Amino acid sequence: MSGREGGKKKPLKAPKKEQSEMDEDTAAFKAKQKEQQKALEAAKQKATKGGPLLQGGIKKSGKK
């Protein structure tokens, strides 16, 4: 390579891959993940609905 050759040899962005068809195992796995995500979101909403459990915060002693 001579000093005058500049730039990158590889393109900055890789070409997009074609979306391959999913087999049954992959489809079942993705469906299971979606169900788990929905259950997690429902649990989060249920947990935040009740309000904070502790109001204490950081306890400070009387000493300095």
From Swiss-Prot:
Stored Pfam families: TMA7 (PF09072)
InterPro entries: TMA7
Coiled-coil stretches noted in the UniProt entry, renumbered to this chain: 21-50
Keywords: Coiled coil
Region annotation Disordered: where it falls in the sequence: 1-64
Comp. bias regions, Basic and acidic residues: 32-44
Family statement drawn from the similarity comment of this UniProt entry: Belongs to the TMA7 family.
Full protein name: Translation machinery-associated protein 7 homolog
